[in-house]
Amino acid sequence: MRNRNGRGGCDRAGKLLWAAPVFAWAGVAKAAKGSEDLALEEKTQSWNLVLVITLLGVCIFCTYLLLTLGQQGSRARWVRYLPESVVTIMLGVLAGSVLTVSGQTLSNLVTFDPQTFFILMLPPIIFESGYSLQKGDFFGNLGSILVFAVLGTLISTIVVGFGAFILGSVGISYPLTLLDALVFGALISATDPVATLAIFHALDVDQTLYMLVFGESVLNDAVAVVLFRTLMTFYEREHESYSEALVQFVLVSLFSGVVGVIVALFSALVLKLTRLYQHPSLETALMFIFAYLPYLLAEALNLSGIMAILFGGIVMSHYSHFNLSTPSQLTCQQTFRTIALIAETAIFAYMGLSLPTLHHTFHMGFICSGMVLILLGRAFNIFPLAAAINRRERQRHQQAARTSPTALPARISLKEQFIMWFSGLRGAIAFSLVLNMQAHSLTAVSPETKSVLVTTTLVIRMWMC
C-alpha cells in the first residue's frame, strides 16, 4: 500500500513538474500580452494627444487670422461677426471627416473622457468667467441676473422636459421617460451666448443688455450643471420625489457658493498678511492653488464644485486680486484667460470631431420638436420674468420718486427681451453634459436613448450656433 501511494505521489509530482513549465509559459505569454496591450494603449493615447494639440494649434491660428482680417479693410469687416466657436467646430468637422475616411483605426483615436472634462476643462472656464466679470455692472444687475439664471433655468428645464415627455407619449417625438426628458431639459438649458456677445461687442450695444446676457450665461452654466447632476442621482435613487430634488438643488447650490466664498476670503487674507508680493512666482503659484481649491473641496463634500469655483472666482477677483503684486496680477489674468481659451477651444473642436466620427441615431421628430421646445422654454423664461422685473422696478421708482409708473420706461424693453430670447444659444456645456450621460454606466437608460440624446444635442448646437 505504501509503495502504491508512493508511486502515486511520484506520478503526481511528475505531472506537476511537467505542468510547471506550461503554467510558467502561460504566465509569461499573458504578461507579454498585457505589456503589448499596455504599449498599444500608450501609443493610442500619444497619437490622441498629438491629434488634439495639432487641432488646437490650427484652431488658435485660425482665430488669429479672423481677428487680423476683421481689423483690416472694409471688405473683411464681416469677419468680425463670425464667431470663433463656429470656425473651431467647422475645423473639427473637417478633421473628423478626414479621420473617418482614413479608416477605423484613426477614428478610434477620438475619445472623450467625462472625468477629464469635469476635472480639467470645465473648472477653468467657469472660474475665468467669474474672475473676469465687470463687478460694478454685474452686481448692479445682480437681482435680474439671478432671476433669469436660476428661475429661468428651472422654467426652461420644466418646459422642455415635460414638453418632450408629452410629445413622445403621443408619438410625435422620440418616447422618453419623464426623468430622461427632464435630464435632457436640464442639459439643453445650458446657454452659450458667445456668438451673440461677439455681435454685441461689435455693435456697441447697451451695457445693461450686455451684462444681463453675459451675467445670465455665467450663472446659468453653473445652475444647469448642478441641476443636471441632481437629476442624474434619480437613476440610482428612484424613491425620491421631485420636491426633494428641488430642495437638494437649492441646498447644494447655496452651500457650494458658501464654500467658494470662504476659500476666496481665506486666500485674500493669506495674501494680505504675508509678504508673498516679494516673490511673484510663489505668489502666482499660490493663487492658482486657491483658484482650484474650491472645486476640489466642494466635490469632496458632495457639493457642486462648479458653483463653488464660480463664486470663488467672483470673490477672488474682488479681494485676492488686489492683494497681489502688479506682475502677479497681470500674470494671473492672462494665464487664467489662456487656460480657459484652450479648454473652450478643445470642447468646440471635439464637438466638430464628433459629428462624423461618433455613431449617431437621428430622430427627426425629436430634433425638430426639441428646437421648438427650446425656443418655447426660452420664451417662458424671458418674457414673464422680464415683465415681473419691470413691474418691480416701476414700483420701486414710484415709491422713491413718487411718480406715475406709466411715466417710467420699462427697465428691460421689449426689443431687448427679444434679443435675450434669441441669445440663449446651446453651447459646449450642453454637449459635454450629454456625453457625460452617455459614458455613465446607467442601466435605466438604453444605449439607443443615449445615442438619440447625443445626436439631438449635437444637431441642435450646430443649427442654433
Can you say where each PLM-predicted feature lies in the sequence?
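Transmembrane helical cores of multi-pass secondary ion antiporters/exchangers
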Residues: 2, 12-465
